[in-house]
Amino acid sequence: MAEIVDVRAREVLDSRGNPTVEADVVLKSGVVGSACAPSGASTGSREALELRDKDPARYMGKGVLKAVDAVNTSIRSALIGRDAREQRELDRIMIDLDGTENKANLGANAILAVSLAAAKAAAQEKGVPLYAHIADINGTSGQYSMPVPMMNILNGGEHADNNVDIQEFMVQPVGVASFREALRVGAEIFHNLKKVLHDKGLNTAVGDEGGFAPNLPSNEAALAAIEEAVTKAGYKLGSDVTLALDCASSEFYKDGQYNLSGEGKVFSSEEFADYLGDLSQRYPIVSIEDGMDESDWDGWAALTRKLGDKVQLVGDDLFVTNTKILKQGIDKGIANSILIKFNQIGSLSETLDAIKMAKDAGFTAVISHRSGETEDTTIADLAVATSAGQIKTGSLCRSDRVAKYNRLLRIEEELAGSAPYRGLKEIKGQE
């Protein structure tokens, strides 16, 4: 038994300088597992609750001492003496202790930090890498693959202070045989994009996730800049590298319309679906995330009808890693992929349940960071353990993003060929 003898938490800072929860789970053997909860900027309204203190005298109300206290008192008392290897049991205890649908009492940030810390402690106790332990929990031991990275190299929306409406413009190096090579391709494109923007007299400052955030006249201008960077890096757009968008449409949806203020355009749901379809015909865009507002299910149905057989349509704010909402989407034929952010649901077990439900329905699952990250690299292990096939963890700068890429490099080296990199085959509609 990997007996838990202590559970403790502290307030630490995330990559945006805001407080978040770090938890330690201590075992009788002396092993300590530590993990941090991430935090989002553009958030779905149905996400599990991130408990903040709302004390304006500390961190402008964003302190997390209440969540830390929940870990140090009620969660600690409930978990001491339990077996850290029994992940689902630990998560169930914390969920029951909270007693709400959205983890509003203890906070999803408190529960998740402990959930992940327990998994790390159990992995250390077993003497196995974290991905191997997560695969054991998930029933996917030995079925590993390396994920295709969606590299967010140009930012707009809530992730940047500019006039570009679409939140993320991403490259996916699909025409290579390993994650290591994919990372190299992405880095070379990133550096070439910086030069392209600089030569046009544009800002090369970066946003929350490490992507560039210049003022551009349109979303298409962002795609054209990336196309130029891909070419300058010596790669071919469409075969070596494909494109992905995160529209984060809920951020510009108002009164039943999509308002692209940067371009001075307003669209109905059908018109915006056509707009995205037009972009994906003119550029090799193979994945579109949150192409419609989270509440616009008719719009999602239209988008899926128009593009669902050839473009991966990822629900983030739409599904918020929640199996109940995902099941509704599956039943109604809406979207064909889910973004997985474990702080949207608040525990490792529930995250694994969402991935399994998606895969069983023929959906893909894209493992994702948040805009407020830490040095914690658990999502890298999660992607490999579940053979998810795709990961979103930002651009090719900022240590909070690069840490995940470097963890994946080490995992690929460790697995020595037993975790294939499948490229385009991992993306829905491109199999």
UniProtKB/Swiss-Prot annotation:
Mg(2+) binds at D246, E289, D316. Its cofactor is Mg(2+). Its main location: cytoplasm. Transmembrane segments: none annotated. Pathway: Carbohydrate degradation; glycolysis; pyruvate from D-glyceraldehyde 3-phosphate: step 4/5. One of its GO terms (biological process) is glycolytic process. Its EC number is 4.2.1.11. The keyword Cytoplasm applies. PANTHER family: ENOLASE. Catalyzes the reversible conversion of 2-phosphoglycerate (2-PG) into phosphoenolpyruvate (PEP). It is essential for the degradation of carbohydrates via glycolysis. This is Enolase. The lineage of its organism: Bacteria, Pseudomonadati, Pseudomonadota, Gammaproteobacteria, Oceanospirillales. The gene is eno.
